[in-house]
């Protein structure tokens, strides 16, 4: 098989901390071009953000069309002196390849490329349909000039995707324990309570917003938003900070703010969720407390790839290699799958995610071989 470990090493050695590409997309483009893929390098820009390089590569012109998606950008390594091996060395020690991005998610991309090249080598260089790669350099930061725009660009060209595999590190403990088939949506906001500033010795001349915001935090936090659904855990609203902008101990503040985030399931849409929280806030305020919510824009909506032939195919490929039947899960944070879901069914399956974003991020060499075999099994079944 094509050596996914070598590709992983070459990618890790590109210090592609967002927004830098540092040659990572070039590594992939060279491999895919050599195998007969038509490749496109697209740079997206937006005022106030860094320009980001993206890569789209496709071989085949007919359906069915499966695309592998991913990101080559990584988070900063942190204190490099704390690493056992240099953060961008890609060195192997004791059965693990070390480096920022080994797990999240250069290893996953390397495995998908290796599997695709092996499949093509065994089928005279052409799939029984189409294989493509959607690779961005803007996932770990603002995600503005990355996958969301790359998908729009592809759609404008007439590209149609039937299914997608996103190689995020989905497994919790061992290879084959989990496929992500959906994600909860994310909505942030700021609760603002108005008072009247005054001297602490004359409280009758002031209105203290601190007790009021405390009551509202309890009111909005205590009652569940829902009790979950068939595929999703219950939604949760979490307050993350409270601030009055006041450093003086003898002044009653005039305003109090509390930031919060909601992770919501398919019991809600973004609009219905906001309406529910606003309704509860109005009830808690009554006629006395003056408060409102400033909602932040969000492109992170809930999505679900319903279990069916595509998930069955992936489960079969995983089980045939690992002997494990993976859980179909919707837990965890957001990913670029939230954008892809608007274009085609998407699943997330990659390496074990235990060390992602940590000092000494590393991937098991054996797991990289296993993932490559699983991706090859998915392709074999997809084009059977």
UniProtKB/Swiss-Prot annotation:
Record's catalysed reaction(s): N-succinyl-(2S,6S)-2,6-diaminopimelate + H2O = (2S,6S)-2,6-diaminopimelate + succinate
Q: How does it assemble?
A: Homodimer.
Q: Which GO terms describe its biological process?
A: diaminopimelate biosynthetic process; L-arginine biosynthetic process; lysine biosynthetic process via diaminopimelate
Q: Where does Zn(2+) 2 bind?
A: 104, 140, 357
Physiological role: Catalyzes the hydrolysis of N-succinyl-L,L-diaminopimelic acid (SDAP), forming succinate and LL-2,6-diaminopimelate (DAP), an intermediate involved in the bacterial biosynthesis of lysine and meso-diaminopimelic acid, an essential component of bacterial cell walls.
Keyword Signal belongs to the record:
no
Enzyme category, top tier:
hydrolase
Report the EC code(s) recorded for this entry: 3.5.1.18
Q: Which gene encodes it?
A: dapE
Source organism (scientific name): Bradyrhizobium sp. (strain BTAi1 / ATCC BAA-1182)
Q: Which Gene3D superfamilies match?
A: Zn peptidases
UniProt entry keywords in alphabetical sequence: Amino-acid biosynthesis, Cobalt, Diaminopimelate biosynthesis, Hydrolase, Lysine biosynthesis, Metal-binding, Zinc
Protein known as: Succinyl-diaminopimelate desuccinylase
């Amino acid at each position: 098989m094509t050596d996914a470990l070598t590709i992983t090493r070459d990618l890790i050695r590109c210090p592609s901390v967002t927004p830098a590409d540092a040659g990572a997309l070039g590594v992939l483009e060279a491999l895919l071009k050599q195998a007969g893929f038509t490749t496109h390098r697209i740079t997206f820009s937006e005022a106030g953000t860094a320009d980001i390089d993206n890569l789209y590569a496709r071989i085949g012109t007919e359906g069915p069309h499966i695309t592998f998606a991913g990101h080559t950008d990584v988070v900063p390594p942190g204190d490099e002196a704390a690493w056992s091996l240099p953060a961008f060395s890609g060195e192997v020690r004791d059965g693990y390849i070390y480096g920022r991005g080994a797990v999240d998610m250069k290893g996953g991309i390397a495995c998908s490329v290796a599997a695709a090249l092996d499949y093509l080598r065994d089928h005279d260089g052409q799939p029984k349909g189409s294989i493509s790669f959607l690779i961005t350099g803007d996932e770990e930061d603002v995600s503005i000039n990355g996958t969301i725009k790359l998908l729009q660009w592809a759609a404008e060209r007439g590209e149609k995707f039937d299914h997608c595999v996103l190689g995020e590190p989905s497994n919790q403990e061992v290879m084959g324990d989990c496929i992500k088939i959906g994600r909860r949506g994310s909505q942030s906001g700021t609760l603002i309570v108005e008072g009247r500033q005054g001297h602490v010795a004359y409280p009758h001349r002031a209105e203290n917003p601190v007790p009021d915001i405390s009551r509202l935090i309890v009111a909005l936090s205590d009652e569940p938003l829902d009790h979950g659904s068939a595929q999703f855990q219950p939604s949760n609203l979490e307050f993350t900070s409270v601030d009055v902008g006041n450093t003086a101990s003898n002044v009653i503040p005039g305003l109090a703010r509390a930031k919060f985030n909601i992770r919501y399931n398919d019991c809600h849409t973004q609009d219905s969720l906001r309406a529910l929280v606003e309704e509860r806030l109005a009830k808690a305020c009554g006629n006395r407390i003056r408060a409102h919510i400033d909602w932040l824009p969000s492109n992170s909506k809930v999505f679900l790839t319903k279990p069916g032939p595509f998930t069955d195919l992936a489960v079969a490929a995983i089980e045939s290699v690992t002997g494990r039947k993976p859980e179909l899960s919707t837990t965890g944070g957001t990913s670029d799958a939230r954008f892809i879901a608007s274009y085609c069914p998407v699943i997330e399956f990659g390496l074990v995610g235990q060390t992602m974003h940590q000092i000494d991020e590393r991937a098991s060499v054996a797991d990289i071989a296993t993932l490559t075999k699983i991706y090859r099994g998915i392709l074999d079944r997809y084009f059977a």
